[in-house]
Structure formats: structure tokens, C-alpha cells
A protein has these predicted regions:
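Catalytic-loop of the protein kinase fold
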Residues: 2-9
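Hydrophobic residue at the +6 position relative to the catalytic HRD Asp in the kinase catalytic loop
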Residues: 10-14
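Helix-rich C-lobe and terminal helical cap/extension of kinase-like folds
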Residues: 15-163
Length: 163
């Protein structure tokens, strides 16, 4: 449950002999509480099947929604999550190099910014994790990677994080 949250490409080295990615910089590592890890797992698993109700419950557990959030704002946030989980929702190798996902997330996020009355800053754990996810997406796009993200995630989709 420890994540290195710095998306800088220079923090890693690829070892061709072992075919492993090696982390060089541990300065931005953060422990994540089991309940946050489990809520993100639920969020991603429910996004795969398009279960907006479960996505909403998981996002609430992470801390995305204030108690007074309007339904429109809630749905806009869920739209962004569905976009962000597109590589997970895709069956087979996702083509990061030919994806316009970053632009679509930007556009969906702009819609959120017009609803200032019900917006609040997500918890720091969420912000650091999103920074890392965005960095991984940009790296995969730069490398024109084709990755079956869904197949990588599914074996872990129903596990609970150890306490």
C-alpha cells in the first residue's frame, strides 16, 4: 500500500536483462490507508461495468463529495472518473499513443469548474494518486504503448488491502 507518487520519467530505469522497471527515487513515496486503497479498487471495478451508484459510493468513501453536493455536480465527477477509467474499461490492449483521453478528461473537468458552489478540493491522498496516474498515462502515450490494463487490474479487483 505504498505508492511512489512522482510521475517524473527520470525516477525509473528499465533493466532490459530482467525486463523490469526499477524505481530510483523513493522520495515521493506515500503510504495509503487500506480503506482508501479499497475504495479506489471499488471505484475502478465499478467503473469497468459502468455502475455509477457504486462508483458514487466509492468516491464518497475517498472524500470526493461534500454532504451538500448537487446531483449534477456528482454526475459530472462520475463522468470524469469514467473517462479516467477508459483504459480499464477497454477489452484488450489500450492504444495510449492514439488516444485523445487526456483532452476528453480536460474537457469534462472544465465542466466541473463551472460548478464552483459545490466543488471542494479532494483529499491529498487522491491528488497525489491522480498526479501519478496522469504521469503514467503521459508516459504510456509518449511511448505509444499498447497495454491490456484491464487484464492487469482484474486479478486484484476483488481483493481487500491488508491492514
Amino acid at each position: 500500500r505504498v505508492i511512489q507518487t512522482d510521475p517524473n520519467f527520470a525516477n525509473f530505469r528499465y533493466d532490459r536483462a530482467t525486463r523490469k522497471l526499477i524505481l530510483l527515487d523513493f522520495g515521493a513515496t506515500r503510504p495509503y490507508p487500506a480503506e482508501i486503497v479499497d475504495a479506489y479498487r471499488r471505484l475502478m471495478a465499478s467503473a469497468i461495468v459502468g455502475d455509477r451508484s457504486e462508483m458514487s459510493a466509492a468516491a464518497s468513501a475517498i472524500g470526493y463529495f461534500r454532504a451538500d453536493i448537487g446531483e449534477r455536480q456528482r454526475q459530472l465527477v462520475l463522468d470524469v472518473f469514467l473517462h479516467a477509467c477508459e483504459p480499464l474499461r477497454h477489452v484488450g490492449a489500450y492504444d495510449f499513443g492514439n488516444s485523445d483521453l487526456a483532452a476528453r478528461i480536460r474537457d469534462a473537468s472544465l465542466a466541473l469548474s463551472t460548478e464552483r458552489d459545490s466543488w471542494h478540493t479532494p483529499p491529498a491522498d487522491a491528488l497525489f494518486l491522480h498526479r501519478k496516474a496522469a504521469g503514467l498515462y503521459l508516459l504510456a502515450a509518449k511511448l505509444k504503448a499498447r497495454v491490456d490494463v484491464r487484464a492487469l487490474f482484474l486479478p486484484y479487483a476483488s481483493r481487500q488491502a491488508p491492514s
